[in-house]
Amino acid sequence: MVIVGGGTAGWMTAAYLKTAFGDRLSITVVESSRIGTIGVGEATFSDIQHFFQFLNLREQDWMPACNATYKLGIRFENWRHVGHHFYQPFEQIRPVYGFPLTDWWLHDAPTDRFDTDCFVMPNLCEAGRSPRHLDGTLADEDFVEEGDELANRTMSEHQGKSQFPYAYHFEAALLAKFLTGYAVDRGVEHVVDDVLDVRLDQRGWIEHVVTAEHGEIHGDLFVDCTGFRGLLLNKALGVPFVSYQDTLPNDSAVALQVPLDMQRRGIVPNTTATAREAGWIWTIPLFGRVGTGYVYAKDYLSPEEAERTLREFVGPAAADVEANHIRMRIGRSQESWRNNCVAIGLSSGFVEPLESTGIFFIHHAIEQLVKHFPAADWNPKSRDMYNSAVAHVMDGIREFLVIHYRGAARADNQYWRDTKTRPLPDGLAERIECWQTQLPDTETIYPYYHGLPPYSYMCILMGGGAIRTPASAALALTDQGAAQKEFAAVRDRAAQLRDTLPSHYEYLARMRGLDV
């Protein structure tokens, strides 16, 4: 196997496949020293636990090396209106008499905050707490760390069985560097060189790549991790790109890496997505700095205006920080696997990082490649099933992102008004009609695996405020006592954890052996 391109996609692929197949599969990574990585995807899904468990990596092994922090969820600011915020946590919704607690909240809300009333994790985010006690035990006592269960299940197989209570933020470049060492130590060949050409055989399959200093590099299976260039899949093999721009117009970003004194400031355990005039700003807390960026649509805002807005948002700490302007290719390749070439990462597809899906797309693609790994006869059905799984995930995430905008009540300028009138992906209008009658469930969300459970949809709809759902009529005829006890249980558990958990900074500092 030849992986063209390093970065997070290339080295996650190399490390995972080497762990899966050992010496039975020869892996070469060809990586240019001149081409930088995009590095937008610094936040993750909680399902990333499967990746590290599969590689048998403990948090203390890799987190300090990658300036990693915990992520208990996403805080959305200004999506309903300026000054309003809500959380989308990693926490399964509690049921009462078969109805989600959010439904009971619609019937008789204890306060005006569905997130802190129905979930524990948003309370810990607002208190700046670690998800682990100082002895390493998880705050979520209902979750059993499953060890081999996580390592031996794919993300799609695990969904719905339990919810790991957090994900991570990390520096993508540092994770790639860490995984480079991990993979090379286990026998992956690392070739630092520029690929000058891709040569095809008479069938149109890739025969070899031509490099500047190492000549021809041959392989049976080629993995395209060349980013938005799509050097192998799109350029050499001519696979078309399917744009999502008709429904997701944000196509640009400007990013800053801002050094900060985290001991003084503290570290919030969540990603923040702050809605702005022509898009939104991400804030990702790392150990020692904050990654931040403005995702916007160039039809509404110039790069200069975007950078100025971002610097004003960050404040004086951004004064001497160099800005990185990124042109994003939003959509997916029509096929992510053609002939003997599989694209993973940005060359396969990308959407704006509103739900931290960049790393998730990579991880899912790797799992599916192992699941559908080609035999000697290159059965086309394996390829077709892989392409279907990857397309469903990306199309499902596309739909979920559209809901963020269609479901946000904010409409204070042309950009936000236009989010309510753009065309919807096929089937979404009917689903929205269902959600105006009842909250999303497994029967009414996007029907194929895409990494997101119904409670995530509930949070976006209830937080955004534009698509209103009434409480189920049955609740008026049902005893209210059990629901009130459940609200009290959430409140009590949140208070207990606020009082007993260390701060996020303290836990991470102690992991690094620092004095606090």
Swiss-Prot record:
The record marks 355 as: Important for activity. The active site is at 71. Its EC number is 1.14.19.60. It comes from the Bacteria. It holds the Pfam family Trp_halogenase. Keywords: FAD, Flavoprotein, Nucleotide-binding, Oxidoreductase. GO terms for molecular function: monooxygenase activity; nucleotide binding. It is an enzyme of class 1 (oxidoreductase). FAD binds at residues 6, 8-9, 42-43, 195, 359. It catalyses: 7-chloro-L-tryptophan + FADH2 + chloride + O2 = 6,7-dichloro-L-tryptophan + FAD + 2 H2O. Chloride binds at residues 357-358. InterPro entries: FAD/NAD-bd_sf, Flavin-dep_Halogenase_NPB, Flavin_halogenase, Trp_halogen. Belongs to the flavin-dependent halogenase family. Bacterial tryptophan halogenase subfamily. Involved in the biosynthesis of kutznerides, actinomycete-derived antifungal and antimicrobial cyclic hexadepsipeptides. Together with KtzQ, catalyzes the regiospecific dichlorination of L-tryptophan (L-Trp) to produce 6,7-dichloro-L-tryptophan. KtzR catalyzes the chlorination of 7-chloro-L-tryptophan at C6 position to yield 6,7-dichloro-L-tryptophan. Can also use L-Trp as substrate and form 6-chloro-L-tryptophan, but has a 120-fold preference for 7-chloro-L-tryptophan over L-Trp. Cannot use piperazic acid or gamma,delta-dehydropiperazic acid. This is 7-chloro-L-tryptophan 6-halogenase KtzR. It comes from Kutzneria sp. (strain 744).
